[in-house]
Amino acid sequence: MSTLSGGLRTLSYEAFLYFYPLVTMDVTRLQAFNSPIGTTPGSGPPNRFSHMRAFPTADFRAVVRPNFDTLYSSAWLDLTAGPVRLTAPDTEDRYYMLPCLDMWTDVFANPGKRTTGTGAGEWVIVGPGHHGELPAGLDVITAPTPYVWIIGRTQTNGIADYPAEHAVQDGYTITPLGAEPEHAVDSNYDLKTEPLKIVNGMAALDYFDYATDLLSVNPPHPTDFSQLARIAALGIEAGKPFDASRFSADERGQIEAGKADALAAMLASLPTLGTSVNGWTVMTDNIGVYGNSYFKRAVVTLVGLGANQPEDAVYPLLNVVADGDPATGDHDYVIHFDADKLPPADAFWSVTMYDAEGFQVANELDRFAIGDRDSLTYDADGSLNLYLQHTNPGVERESNWLPAPLGPLGVTMRLYAPKAEVLDGRWHPPVVQKA
């Protein structure tokens, strides 16, 4: 290995980034497979949905920046024993989507209102290389990997809408067309540590050993040849065991340093992950499907595993207000939308308030988000003001009030099925002004 020592750090850096989504997805999958049913979305045996039946409460801490627009229906597919049939009910024009992610975090299919409409739907999902008879008359979706994560979302119009929402969720079904895959629970698997902490805490050589095993099960994308050819110098090749003993102590140090470099670079890139405009960061390209942008794919895994394609949802994040300072609950703010500049979405839009850690905070209205499905008050000219502040602005403005906690604020706008002007950059969220 001495002839490669000078490049080991760089190769380790590249390999860590390349495999980061795959390893993180597998840890997430195994936590779900080994968790009791209903513990987390998607938990329990494969090939069945687990539904979130209500919005998160004020003390919910399972995930950061939860949404209050849709309820989740999550499932992990195991296609190793054969295809499955996926069904969705007639949602009667209700917005829904069932994005299917491969183990590299690419959304390879997304049945739902935007793509297939809201009538009842049926699809067969097959694993890579499948050969065999399939039911006639059904659309076939070929998964790039034998394991698939479906992160379904269904529009919810407040608590009173839950019964109708639950009826739609109950209409999502997964039926194996062959034998049930084997499912043995590992009672010793770590279910308490979040997947990112597990992955980031792995020693580099253990990480690459794990990644090599996964590569033998989950085919790389067809355009990955060049990257795989480079990292083969580390001994990472599908179908071959990874031999960590071949490296000297110095080489091990360089490999570990490459992993550390990769993590540091990912964290350093966060402020520039999207386009910064009017104090907001907006990502409208190269997300959900990444091609050969391995660095972007890894960073999105770090900050938003399971991200949608921008055609389905865009999430502007507030960084600073008009004076260039971050928003805090010590000040009152206004988001003003001109009548012709309201958030352009074919489905719906919202603004959600979090604290600095990305969690909702209890308030007198039990309101954590506000949007176009709420009873908002518009000005006579059709424009709209949203009031972001800690104290109640009074009865005349309460309908447009998004309560804010004290301290640093985390504000996220969500546009579902955004229109073309969002995706091509003609529309931007407005500058947030101090009141």
Feature annotation, model-predicted:
Residues 1-435:
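A compositional/structural signature for long, glycine/proline-rich flexible linkers
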